[in-house]
C-alpha cells in the first residue's frame, strides 16, 4: 500500500477497512471529500476506480440489452467482474430495487447480468458507498432520501466523515487565522495496530 500527498484525517481508517475486505459506508455533508477519499483509497491499493452516482433505475446498476441485442455494461458490472474499487455515491437517493440487486450480488458473490451471464465476484472487488444520511430516510436538510433496508446496511462498516479543516488549510497553505504560509503544511496522522484491532472488534460487534 502506497500513500502519497495530503489526505483526510480518516483516510487511514477507511484504507484499513477496505484493505481488510470490508464494505465502507461514508456518511458526511456535501463537499467533505467523500469522492476524493474513495479515489485516494483506490490509488493507494493500486486498483482501478469506478464511480456511480444516485441510481434511479435498476438497469443503471446492472446494464441492459439494446435494440440490436448488445449488452450495455455499467461501472458496477465492470468492477465486479474485473476488480477495482467501486464508489456508489448518493446511495441513499437511489432506487430500493437497485439496492436489493446490489446486496444480492455482494452476499452471494454472483451477479446475474441481463445478457444471461453469471458473473463471479472478482477477488479484488472493493466497495465504498457514500451518502449524506445514515440510511434512515429524509432529513430536514436532505429531502428525497430513501430509507435503506437493514439487509443492505448490515453489510457495511459505517464511517462518519466531516470537514477536515487542517486538510483545507494545508491545500490552501494558510494557517487557521487566515495568514498565508510560506511552506507546505502536510497533515500526518498514524494509528497503532492496537487501535485498528479495537475498531474492527467494534465493527464486528455492530454486525
What are these regions (language model features)?
Residues 1-207:
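C-terminal regulatory/interaction module of P-loop NTP-utilizing enzymes
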